[in-house]
Design a protein with these regions (language model features):
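Catalytic beta-strand/loop cores that center a nucleophilic Ser/Cys/Thr
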Residues: 17-133
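Amphipathic alpha-helical interaction segments
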Residues: 10-11, 45, 73, 80, ...
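Residues at secondary-structure transition points
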Residues: 13, 17, 41, 139-141
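Extracellular ligand-binding/catalytic regions of CAZymes and related secreted enzymes
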Residues: 94, 101-181
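Glycine-centered secondary-structure boundary/capping sites
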Residues: 4, 33-35, 181
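Residue-level detector of flexible, active-site-proximal loop/helix-junction positions
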Residues: 9, 91, 136
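Helix-loop-strand module that forms the ligand-binding subsite of alpha/beta enzymes
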Residues: 1-13
Length: 181
């Protein structure tokens, strides 16, 4: 079983015309992963909803928890082979037109028009992939991307909020235990 985190849903970015904008390019690893990164809005506070608290991967997690993270917009590649673990009501992408990556249609929204997938399991043969979109970290070099909505005071020089969350640490422990068990 493969455990994939945050940035593994990305890959190649192609320049769009003469602009500085880029568009993500699907490759064969997205088929195996079962997810494709379209773009991301700015870093913000996110309420993560646990879809199934009885699954071994979500054992011990609350029904929801909050983190400050970069909300990846993940297009699910094989919905019929995918079990959702984590979601968030983030709604349509409200990023300014000059930020993020270019995409034709927001295919990362679930049918309700407001929910996005932040974690899932995809069965592949006798194994599978667990993907968790959470886990963004940043340093002073990228601090300007921190959304004002995410802070209540001074902006931190280093952001690793998700990695300091008890729920996220439990999720990673569960994923490792489940993957090797």
């Amino acid at each position: 079983h493969w455990l994939a985190l945050h940035g593994s849903s990305g890959g190649k970015a192609a320049r769009v015309g003469d602009s500085k904008r880029r568009r993500m390019v699907k490759t064969s690893h997205h088929d195996t992963l079962g997810g494709f990164f379209l773009s991301h809005p700015p870093i913000r506070k996110i309420r993560v909803d646990v879809v199934d608290t009885s699954h071994p991967l979500t054992k011990g997690l609350p029904e929801s928890f909050e983190v400050i993270d970069e909300p990846y917009m993940i297009e699910i590649q094989h919905p019929s082979e995918t079990q959702l673990l984590l979601t968030a009501e983030l709604g349509p992408d409200d990023s300014a037109l000059d930020t993020g990556f270019v995409y034709d249609k927001d295919t990362a929204l679930l049918p309700d028009g407001k929910t996005r997938v932040l974690g899932y399991i995809r069965r592949v043969g006798k194994g599978g992939v667990t993907y968790i979109a959470l886990g963004h970290c940043h340093s002073p070099a990228s601090q300007n991307r921190l959304s004002a909505a995410a802070t209540t005071g001074d902006r931190p020089a280093v952001l690793r909020n998700t990695w300091e969350s008890e729920a996220y640490i439990q999720l990673l422990r569960n994923a490792i235990e489940w993957g090797v068990g």
